[in-house]
């Protein structure tokens, strides 16, 4: 059962509609009891890192999620801020992250006014992926590999082996990461048309 963590943040209805079109069942989890039958987990997220972490901590689901992901090895995918929450920490806030894939969330820095003008923040719009290594998550993507982005911070994993794909916005940064059963994507698959559907369908098939 694909379960999306409903802790008050993220466009969960968009994922429900997308999976409904694929005839794949998806359920919402707003407490630990709803996680009991999870065989795959989606962790969405929008907004500020600390707010998202506090909302998840307050939901009462964090310990159960740690158990499912780290001990029972249930596949999980974090999306946008949901991916950033998988890091150890973020320059945006003070709270600790989940630490599922060691790394730090950093803010895009602009060393000159020209760069700031060319690459304004937030990074908003379409960008293509550069594949760093093969992954089942990437099956079915088209040749251009365009995805929709909206963010001002990026995830820098400690181990480059965890980088699946990168994007370029003034410099190359990780936009898809993976360690064992843990996946994270910075872009918004629910807004990325064919490629977003293909990626979420591939996650359902893991």
UniProtKB/Swiss-Prot annotation:
Active site (UniProt): 80 (nucleophile), 188, 190
Origin superkingdom: Bacteria
Keyword terms, alphabetized: Amino-acid biosynthesis, Cytoplasm, Glutamine amidotransferase, Histidine biosynthesis, Hydrolase, Lyase
Residue ranges occupied by any Glutamine amidotransferase type-1 domain in the UniProt entry: 1-206
InterPro entries, A to Z: Class_I_gatase-like, GATASE, Imidazole-glycPsynth_HisH
Enzyme Commission code: 4.3.2.10, 3.5.1.2
GO function term, MF aspect, one: imidazoleglycerol-phosphate synthase activity
Pfam families found in the cross-reference section: GATase
Entry GO terms, CC: cytoplasm
GO biological process, one term: L-histidine biosynthetic process
Pathway terms, separated by semicolons: Amino-acid biosynthesis; L-histidine biosynthesis; L-histidine from 5-phospho-alpha-D-ribose 1-diphosphate: step 5/9
Keyword Signal: no
Subcellular location: Cytoplasm
Gene3D superfamilies hit by this protein: 3.40.50.880
Catalytic activity: 5-[(5-phospho-1-deoxy-D-ribulos-1-ylimino)methylamino]-1-(5-phospho-beta-D-ribosyl)imidazole-4-carboxamide + L-glutamine = D-erythro-1-(imidazol-4-yl)glycerol 3-phosphate + 5-amino-1-(5-phospho-beta-D-ribosyl)imidazole-4-carboxamide + L-glutamate + H(+); L-glutamine + H2O = L-glutamate + NH4(+)
SUPFAM superfamilies per UniProt: Class I glutamine amidotransferase-like
Oligomeric and partner information: Heterodimer of HisH and HisF.
Primary role: IGPS catalyzes the conversion of PRFAR and glutamine to IGP, AICAR and glutamate. The HisH subunit provides the glutamine amidotransferase activity that produces the ammonia necessary to HisF for the synthesis of IGP and AICAR.
HAMAP family per the UniProt record, alphabetical: HisH (MF_00278)
NCBIfam families: IMP_synth_hisH (TIGR01855)
Listed name of the protein: Imidazole glycerol phosphate synthase subunit HisH 3
Source species of the chain: Vibrio vulnificus (strain YJ016)
Name of the gene: hisH3
């Amino acid at each position: 059962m694909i379960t999306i963590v409903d802790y008050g943040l993220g466009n969960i209805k968009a994922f429900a509609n997308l999976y409904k079109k694929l005839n794949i069942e998806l359920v919402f989890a707003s407490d630990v009891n709803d996680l009991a039958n999870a065989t795959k987990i989606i962790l969405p997220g929008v907004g500020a890192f600390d707010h998202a972490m506090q909302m998840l901590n307050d939901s009462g689901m964090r310990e159960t999620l740690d158990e499912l992901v780290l001990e029972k090895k249930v596949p999980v995918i974090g999306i946008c801020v949901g991916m950033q929450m998988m890091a150890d920490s973020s320059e945006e806030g003070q709270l600790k992250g989940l630490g599922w894939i060691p790394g730090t969330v950093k803010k895009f820095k602009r060393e000159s006014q020209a760069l700031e003008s060319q690459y304004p923040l937030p990074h908003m719009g379409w960008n293509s992926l550069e594949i760093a290594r093969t992954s089942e998550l990437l099956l079915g993507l088209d040749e251009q590999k365009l995805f929709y982005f909206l963010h001002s911070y990026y995830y820098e994993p400690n181990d480059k082996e965890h980088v699946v794909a990168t994007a370029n916005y003034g410099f190359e940064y990780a936009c898809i990461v993976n360690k064992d059963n843990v996946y994270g994507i910075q872009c918004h698959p629910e807004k990325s048309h064919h490629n977003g559907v293909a990626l979420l369908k591939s996650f359902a098939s893991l």
